[in-house]
C-alpha cells in the first residue's frame, strides 16, 4: 500500500469517526439529564446499583434566575422573592462501574417575609413564628454522589450520599438566623441474573436545624413570637421569655435534630419494578439536659412501575403509596440549684401532638426516543393531626387534597415547548372535645387566623400551570424561559390580616445551560 492510498484511507476513517461522534452527540442531547434519570426505575429509589442497568452517559450544567410575586400565598411566603443559582449533574458509565453526581448553589432574597422561622416549615412538630415583615436571605448548598461497582457477573455493590445545607437569615428585628443540615447515606447491594434483579439498601439520615434570634439597636417596640406545638396551639409571648425557649440559659438557640434508620428492598423482573421501604426516626428539640421535646415516628412506602416498550417509544406506568406517623412528647423540666450548682431535672412527659400523613398517586407516561413525552396522573394526600396540649381538651383536624396533573414536551426544530398543568381541590374537618366531669380554667391558646389561612390555602380549589420555551443552540447549549402561575378558583379565601387577597401567584425564570 502506497503512502497516498494510506493517507486517503486515514482521511476517510477520520471522516467516518467524526460523523459517528456527531450522530452520537445528537442522540445524546435529545436525551436530557432529567429524561435519562427518569426512564430508569431504579433512579427513583434507594439502590444506586440500578445505574448499571442503563448505559447512556449524560451531563448538564446550568445557571438560572427567577422572580416570584403575587398575592395568592401561604402565611409563610414572602410578598416578593428572587433567586439565582447554579447546578450541575452527571451520570457516567465505565467498564466496571457507574457514577452519579450533582451539586447546586442558590441564593434567594425575600421581601416582606415573616411567619415561620424554620427553613422547612412543618418538618419538625414544633415551630417558631414571628410577626414583623422584613427581608430574608436563604443560601442553599446541595451535593449528591453515588457509585455502583460490578463485583462479578451477578453481584453489584454501591452507595449514595445526599447532602444539603442552608443558611436562612432575617435582617430586621426580630432578627433570626437559621442553620440547617440534611444528610442521607444509603449503601446498597444487588444480585442479578438474566431478567431478574434483587436489591437491598440500608438508609441512614440525619437532619438538624438551629434557630437563633436577637434584637439589635435601641427600639421602643416589643417583639412577640409564638411557639406552635401542633395545629397552631401553643404559647405567644415576648420573644425572649423562657416559655418560648428561643433564648434560654444553657442552650444555644432553638435546636432540633432527627435521626432516621431503615431499609429498602427492590425487585425487577423484566419490565416490572417495585421497591418497599420502612424507616424509623427519633428526634428531639433542645440540647444537653434541656431536651424540651422528643418526637418518634415511622414511615413506610411502596413504589411499583411497569414499562411497555415500543418502536421508538415506551409507555411507563407508575404507582406510589407512603404513610408516615409521628408523636411529639413535651418533657416536664425544672432547674434545681444545690450547693451553687444548677441542674435540670426531668419529672415526666406529656404527649401533646400526633400526626399522620398519607400520600398516594398513579401516573402514565409516554416517552419517545427523541426526548418528547406526555404524562398524566392523579394524587391524593391526607393529613390527620391530633393536639392534646392542654388536658382535658382534645382537638383534631383532617385534610384531604386530591389533584390531577398532566405535562407535555414537544420539539419544533431547535425549540422545545413544555406545558405543565395541575388542578387540586381539598376538604378539611375539625373537631374539638373536652372530657366530661373535668374542670379546666381555660382552653389552650391558638393562633386561629393563621391556622384558618394555612388550611384554606392547602385545601382550596386551585390550578397551577407552567409554560416553558427552550432554544437549543449547537453543541448542547440551551436558553430557556418559563412562566409559572398558581391561581385559586374560588372568590372567598380566609387570610391573615395584612396578607393580600390576590388570586394569582407568579414565577418567571430564565435559564442558560449546557448538555454534554
How does the language model describe each region?
Residues 25-111, 124:
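N-terminal, post-signal peptide beta-strand-biased segments of exported outer-membrane/organellar beta-barrel
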Residues 61-67, 101-107, 159-165, 200-206, ...:
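Transmembrane beta-barrel strands of outer-membrane/channel proteins
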Residues 96, 314-316, 353-446:
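Detector for outer-membrane/organellar transmembrane beta-barrel domains
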Residues 71-77, 112-118, 168-176, 211-217, ...:
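Outer-membrane beta-barrel translocator domains and adjoining extracellular loop/strand segments
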Residues 191-193, 503-516:
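Outer-membrane beta-barrel "beta-signal"
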Residues 94-97, 150-154, 192-194, 270-272, ...:
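Outer-membrane beta-barrel channels and translocator barrels
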Residues 237-376:
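Long, internal scaffold/assembly segments composed of regular secondary structure
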Residues 80-86, 137-143, 177-185, 255-261, ...:
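Residues that define the transmembrane beta-barrel architecture of outer-membrane proteins
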Amino acid at each position: 500500500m502506497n503512502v497516498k492510498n494510506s493517507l486517503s484511507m486515514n482521511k476517510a476513517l477520520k471522516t467516518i469517526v467524526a460523523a459517528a461522534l456527531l450522530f452520537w452527540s445528537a442522540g445524546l442531547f435529545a436525551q436530557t439529564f432529567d429524561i435519562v434519570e427518569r426512564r430508569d426505575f431504579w433512579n427513583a429509589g434507594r439502590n444506586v446499583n440500578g445505574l448499571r442497568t442503563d448505559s447512556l452517559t449524560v451531563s448538564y450544567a446550568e445557571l438560572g434566575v427567577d422572580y416570584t410575586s403575587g398575592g395568592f400565598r401561604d402565611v409563610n411566603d414572602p410578598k416578593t422573592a428572587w433567586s439565582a443559582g447554579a447546578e450541575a449533574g452527571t451520570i457516567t458509565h465505565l467498564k466496571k462501574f457507574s457514577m452519579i453526581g450533582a451539586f447546586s448553589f442558590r441564593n434567594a432574597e425575600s421581601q416582606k417575609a415573616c411567619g415561620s422561622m424554620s427553613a422547612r416549615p412543618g418538618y419538625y412538630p414544633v415551630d417558631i413564628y414571628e410577626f414583623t415583615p422584613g427581608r430574608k436571605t436563604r443560601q442553599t448548598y446541595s451535593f449528591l454522589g453515588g457509585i455502583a461497582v460490578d463485583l462479578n457477573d451477578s453481584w453489584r455493590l454501591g452507595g449514595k450520599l445526599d447532602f444539603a445545607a442552608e443558611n436562612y437569615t432575617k435582617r430586621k428585628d426580630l432578627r433570626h438566623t437559621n442553620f440547617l443540615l440534611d444528610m442521607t447515606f444509603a449503601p446498597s447491594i444487588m444480585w442479578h441474573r438474566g431478567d431478574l434483579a434483587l436489591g437491598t439498601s440500608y438508609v441512614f439520615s440525619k437532619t438538624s436545624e438551629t434557630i437563633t434570634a436577637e434584637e439589635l439597636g435601641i427600639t421602643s417596640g416589643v417583639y412577640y413570637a409564638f411557639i406552635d406545638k401542633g395545629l397552631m396551639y401553643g404559647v405567644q409571648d415576648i420573644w425572649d421569655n423562657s416559655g418560648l425557649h428561643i433564648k434560654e440559659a444553657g442552650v444555644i438557640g432553638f435546636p432540633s435534630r432527627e435521626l432516621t434508620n431503615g431499609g429498602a428492598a427492590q425487585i425487577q423482573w423484566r419490565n416490572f419494578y417495585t421497591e418497599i421501604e420502612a424507616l424509623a426516626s427519633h428526634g428531639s428539640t433542645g440540647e444537653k439536659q434541656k431536651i424540651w421535646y422528643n418526637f418518634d415516628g415511622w414511615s413506610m412506602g411502596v413504589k411499583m412501575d411497569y414499562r411497555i416498550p415500543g418502536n421508538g417509544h415506551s409507555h411507563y406506568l407508575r404507582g406510589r403509596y407512603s404513610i408516615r406517623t409521628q408523636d411529639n412528647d413535651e418533657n416536664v423540666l425544672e432547674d434545681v440549684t444545690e450547693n451553687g450548682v444548677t441542674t435540670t431535672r426531668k419529672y415526666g412527659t406529656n404527649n401533646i401532638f400526633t400526626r399522620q400523613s398519607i400520600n398516594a398517586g398513579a401516573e402514565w407516561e409516554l416517552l419517545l426516543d427523541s426526548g418528547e413525552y406526555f404524562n398524566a396522573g392523579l394524587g391524593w394526600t391526607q393529613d390527620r393531626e391530633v393536639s392534646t396540649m392542654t388536658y382535658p381538651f382534645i382537638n383534631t383536624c383532617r385534610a384531604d387534597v386530591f389533584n390531577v396533573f398532566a405535562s407535555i414536551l414537544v420539539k419544533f426544530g431547535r425549540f422545545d415547548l413544555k406545558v405543565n398543568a395541575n388542578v387540586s381541590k381539598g376538604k378539611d374537618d375539625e373537631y374539638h372535645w373536652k372530657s366530661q366531669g373535668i374542670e379546666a380554667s381555660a382552653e389552650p391558646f391558638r393562633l386561629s387566623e393563621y391556622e384558618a389561612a394555612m388550611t384554606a390555602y392547602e385545601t382550596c380549589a386551585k390550578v397551577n400551570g407552567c409554560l416553558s420555551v427552550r432554544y437549543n443552540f449547537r453543541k448542547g447549549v440551551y436558553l430557556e424561559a418559563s412562566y409559572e402561575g398558581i391561581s385559586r378558583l374560588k372568590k372567598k379565601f380566609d387570610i391573615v390580616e395584612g396578607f393580600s387577597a390576590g388570586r394569582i401567584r407568579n414565577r418567571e425564570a430564565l435559564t442558560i445551560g449546557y448538555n454534554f
